[in-house]
């Protein structure tokens, strides 16, 4: 354990780096406001005294627009129906929620949308009757691939008046793919003849059409869903109201923070302008990177926080919300603690069935590669996603290799003999700073594309060598100390 004064120094330095770099982004946003407004049409509203808003983050704008139109009211309807069903018809609550989910899906996606979800679900259920994991996965991948066929896309576009409706269908089918895959694989693992009626088609529909997670997740495995949905214990009305009030308070704070960032820092518009990105100062470049990943974090606190709140009111335990990215210091931690539901899905249904760590080094490398290949394809399979997946695979592989090396008895004895616990902690943070730099780079590729990643690589690691590179690693060294201390506290709690 490091001295308190040293940890406090690292924390203050980290906060100082954050705020100063954000200030640099704010200045650049103001200086180039007219230029960015002409190119990207910044929005004007009265939320923050008339400040213009960067609305170029498609995902945030998309879900906020749908939320105002339909989703907030449909989610409120789910909450009311669920509470009424719990009070009046508890035994039939899963089927009532299933019917409500179908109706809500019909409200926003129409008959063709509901039919597509039903079609994919039915095909997956029929294939699962063969009790073959291989056939189930081939079926799921085939259904997923149909979402990217140009001819199929054109047909689906003709069903709707706006692009937003088409994209909502695409997002819904993409997330539903993980849900019907989870059910089908769980069915494959049941011994014949299946004694439980939990793996019937009605339960599959109740799982797939559970509305809070229908369009965007988070991911909850069927085994967890069925176990929790069948339990009879539920919170009292008073406890539910407390959960609702606290949850809404947190959601409003997260939403306000995300909107404030979009009004003060035009990071998404600047990322879309590569010539401008190549000319800003290194401080601004660092602030843009921090602002981008932190906005992504706050955005998913909202997007996952809303369904998580409704799941708690329904008596379900949702996956944990993302942990703050400023406390992440490894690829492994990022995957484990950001999208917990997706991580659990990948481990349970991809990594372990392929072989996991039970087949030696090559088996581990292959299982990890297959996991990242699937998650890249599931996200869309674009070039920048394969690059992002490769960087993550390499990062996780190197981290696990270093961890195994350090855990060997010979290295352990040498470290214990020649280095104090404080020195070992500092050495850990130094290694973590290198990993964190690559983690941020991979996240920027995911959020901004290959061109943004290349710009950062050239400016920080090629043109900026040695002083800019070493300065960045020094800043990340402070971040890593904070992250390591946070991780230890998190593990203790």
Curated annotation (Swiss-Prot):
Keywords per UniProt: Acyltransferase, Developmental protein, Disease variant, Dwarfism, Endoplasmic reticulum, Golgi apparatus, GTP-binding, Lipoprotein, Membrane, Nucleotide-binding, Palmitate, Transferase, Transmembrane, Transmembrane helix
GO cellular component: endoplasmic reticulum; endoplasmic reticulum membrane; Golgi apparatus; Golgi membrane
Intramembrane segments: 95-119, 203-217
Effect of residue 257 to P: In NNMS; uncertain significance
Lipid attachment site numbers (S-palmitoyl cysteine): 188, 242, 324, 410
Annotated active site: 379
UniProt note: pH dependence: Optimum pH is 6.5.
Record GO terms (molecular function): GTP binding; O-acyltransferase activity; palmitoyltransferase activity
GO BP, sorted A to Z: N-terminal peptidyl-L-cysteine N-palmitoylation; smoothened signaling pathway
Record EC number: 2.3.1.-
Record protein name field: Protein-cysteine N-palmitoyltransferase HHAT
Organism: Homo sapiens (Human)
Gene designation per UniProt: HHAT
